[in-house]
A protein has these predicted regions:
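Internal helix-loop-helix
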Residues: 48-119, 160-166
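A short, Trp-centered hydrophobic/proline-enriched beta-strand micro-motif
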Residues: 118-126
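Intrinsic disorder at enzyme termini
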Residues: 1-9, 142
Length: 184
């Protein structure tokens, strides 16, 4: 496997990210862990630095940055500085791509600009009280009704859920098929 080392531009980015995590994240980490919530201000500050959803297209306010090494730098610096709940990675690399890759144009226009700026906090709801993270054992159901869907079920351990503005919810749409899941 050929290693693609970080170039000088990436090292400048790392220096900037390191300063951000030292000044804006590390001092609050213990308080956030005790309270089980990351301050909304952290998302706004990360957005102001351009650290949220860097992959997103420029038309939504992103940088259109496809090189994962920049994200890798953020992940490394976040871990090195106390890992205050994965707020950047969960928001930008787990939840937002569902919108970016599968959302309608209207959903992208509505939600991505705020996710990029940090004004809109994203969460994902998959884990259930009786099924845990076993998605095949999920009990939540979604049934199509006229021009919308009706969701029924329970979720727990919703990462970023306590302060989320938008929550992606997984539910079974084809209960007979263990893979018959849809994200809403």
């Amino acid at each position: 496997m050929q290693r693609r080392p970080f170039d000088s531009e990436m090292e400048l980015f790392r220096d900037s990210a390191r300063k951000f995590f030292q000044q804006e994240i590390r001092p609050h980490g213990e308080r956030w862990r005790e309270a089980n919530i990351v301050d909304r201000e952290a998302f706004l500050k990360a957005g102001a630095q351009g650290y949220l959803c860097m992959w997103a297209d420029e038309q939504y306010g992103g940088m259109g940055l496809k090189d994962f090494r920049y994200e890798q730098i953020l992940i490394e610096e976040n871990a090195f500085h106390g890992d205050s709940g994965y707020f950047i990675s969960l928001h930008s690399r787990l939840v937002a791509p569902y919108l970016g890759n599968f959302g309608t144009d209207e959903q992208k226009q509505r939600f991505l600009p705020g996710a990029i700026s940090g004004e809109t906090i994203l969460a994902v709801a998959m884990t259930e009280p009786d099924a845990g993270s076993d998605l095949a054992g999920m009990k939540s159901r979604a049934v199509e009704h006229d021009d919308h869907w009706v969701l029924n079920g329970s979720k727990t351990y919703i990462s970023n859920g306590i302060n989320a503005d938008v929550v992606i919810v997984a539910a079974k749409t084809h209960p007979e098929n263990p893979h018959g899941l849809t994200l809403f």
